[in-house]
């Protein structure tokens, strides 16, 4: 129930951003059009955003024949978690990373890059996929997929406001500086909405993944290795669609400044420390 409340609040907050930007572009008429657009986007995001994200990353579905060891690993972990078998995808990218998507456990998918399969041991990879299945178990995947889709749409709409100008509430041409401000601040506002739900969600998925796999130390080792390797390997699809970065087990984006300030992922060192404490004491710290 709490996840449905979070989903509703996320949709409401991002819809409000759409309306504000619509008002900047076209006054009252723009606000109404933006509201209709936001409602349409919410509907689309619920039903189709998982397919869109998988297409963005050119993810290829695999099965027990094409990737037997990886597929059976996910199958075994899904059984341990009491989940239906998700669809399994591989992404031909060198950067080690993984994510889960879908609107519910019955329509879930997990995806991993070829890079993560190449650098992790079987035990570490098992920890990563258990983490992704924990997102499915906690029903986080709908929230993360919707927020990624809607945040991308907000950025596009804000850029539209800059290039095509706008109208105030009386229908007069809007201040162009205000349009530029919207283009800068609207994506940041969308990122902050994502941050409000993403960081705590990653800690919970670490705890849940360690419980599913029964091996918190393996996930800690995997996070350390992914963090070190990912920093030196660009991920073109993620850079092209930065709003989807919060879906990944590790931030795939490069660069400093705002990219780090508004990171939707908690510090890797803290994630590892919590998992190591769980390995030693059997309890994940609050």
UniProtKB/Swiss-Prot annotation:
It comes from Ralstonia pickettii (strain 12J). The active site is at 132. This is Protease HtpX homolog. It is a multi-pass membrane protein. One of its GO terms (molecular function) is zinc ion binding. CDD domains: M48B_HtpX_like (cd07336). Belongs to the peptidase M48B family. PROSITE patterns: ZINC_PROTEASE. One of its GO terms (cellular component) is plasma membrane.
């Amino acid at each position: 129930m709490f996840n449905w409340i979070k989903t509703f609040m996320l949709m409401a907050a991002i819809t409000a951003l759409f309306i504000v930007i619509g008002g900047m572009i076209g006054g009252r008429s723009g606000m109404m059009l933006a509201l209709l657009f936001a409602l349409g986007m919410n509907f689309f995001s619920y039903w189709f955003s998982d397919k869109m994200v998988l297409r963005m990353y050119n993810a290829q579905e695999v099965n027990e024949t094409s990737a037997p060891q990886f597929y059976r690993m996910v199958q075994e972990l899904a059984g341990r978690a009491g989940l239906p078998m998700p669809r399994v995808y591989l992404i031909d990218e060198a950067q080690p990373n993984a994510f889960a998507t879908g609107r519910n456990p019955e329509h879930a998918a997990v995806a991993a890059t070829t890079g993560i399969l190449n650098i992790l041991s079987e035990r570490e990879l098992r920890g990563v996929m258990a983490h992704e299945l924990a997102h499915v178990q906690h029903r986080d995947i709908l929230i993360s997929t919707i927020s990624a889709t809607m945040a991308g749409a907000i950025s596009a709409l804000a850029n539209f406001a800059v290039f095509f100008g706008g109208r105030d509430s009386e229908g007069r041409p809007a201040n162009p500086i205000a349009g530029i401000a919207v283009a800068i601040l609207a994506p940041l506002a969308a990122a902050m909405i994502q941050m409000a739900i993403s960081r705590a969600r990653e800690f919970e998925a670490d705890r849940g993944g360690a419980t599913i796999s029964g091996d918190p130390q393996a996930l800690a080792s995997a996070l350390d290795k992914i963090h070190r390797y990912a920093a030196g390997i660009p991920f073109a699809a993620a850079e092209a669609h930065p709003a989807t970065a919060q879906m990944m087990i590790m931030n795939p984006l490069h660069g400093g400044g705002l990219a780090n300030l508004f990171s939707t992922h908690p510090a890797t060192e803290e994630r590892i420390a919590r998992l190591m404490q769980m390995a030693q004491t059997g309890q994940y710290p609050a």
